A protein has these predicted regions:
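Positively charged n-region of N-terminal signal peptides that target proteins for export
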Residues: 1-6
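Bacterial N-terminal signal peptides
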Residues: 8-19
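Gly/Pro-rich, tryptophan- and cysteine-flecked surface segments typical
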Residues: 21-216
């Protein structure tokens, strides 16, 4: 069964690389929004370290597009896509944040705890976050990118054998091209389809005030 799934995934990648698909994406024009905070990238490193040390991603909703006193204004979705260091998407999810909200996520236990390819999870990889406004958070859909979110991540460094230290950096803004805007949610849908339960990262306990937005 796993062999069949891998074969299907290979066919899906081939389809994504086909001229027809590329032409369809190119026709979409530039990305919806290119300001800071729309599309952000960072890395995780030494996940499987001997000390068992974890890494953390913190996402802040700046509240720039809504009044936090209103129950429906200012909400935003953090579409999160995690890759290993061979460029394969392994997990994805979309987490709701209210205005001025702080979402804290564990790399080991939430962002890379249910990889498509199973365990062991990769030690190093890339985390991509797209700020998206919609009425229901879903990483398989990316329709209204905006610059609501700020993100920071800690990293486990190993300067010498047996010694681990923690550093922290802000996520780096990237350019959300129309190709990337189309690729990320489509690849996520393949990950969820092929994973049959695997490939979904975890946003943590649900906040009752986020019920109308939910997480996926």
């Amino acid at each position: 069964m796993k062999t069949i799934k891998i074969a299907v995934l290979i066919l899906a990648v081939v389809a994504l690389c086909s001229p027809m698909f590329a032409q369809t994406i190119s026709a979409a024009g530039p990305g919806s929004d290119t300001g800071p905070g729309v599309y952000q990238l960072n890395y995780f490193s030494n996940r499987n370290n001997a000390a068992g040390a974890d890494q953390t991603v913190r996402i802040i909703n700046s509240g720039s597009s809504g009044d936090p006193l209103s129950p429906t204004q200012g909400f935003n979705c953090a579409n999160i896509y995690t890759f290993d260091d061979t460029q394969e998407m392994l997990e994805c999810c979309s987490c709701p944040l209210s205005a001025n909200d702080l979402l804290t996520l564990s790399v080991n236990n939430q962002l890379m705890q249910n990889p498509l390819t199973g365990f062991p999870a990769p030690s190093n990889g890339v985390i991509k976050i797209v700020s998206d406004y919609k009425t229901k958070c879903n990483a398989e859909v990316l329709t209204n990118p905006n610059w609501q979110l700020l993100a920071y991540g800690t990293h486990i460094q190993q300067p010498v054998t047996g010694q681990f230290v923690t550093t922290e950096t802000a996520f780096t803004p990237g350019y959300l091209s129309s190709q990337e805007q189309a690729f990320l949610p489509l690849a996520c849908s393949f990950v969820h389809f092929l994973g049959t339960g695997k490939g979904k990262c975890d946003c943590g306990p649900a906040d009752p005030s986020h019920n109308s937005f939910s997480a996926n």
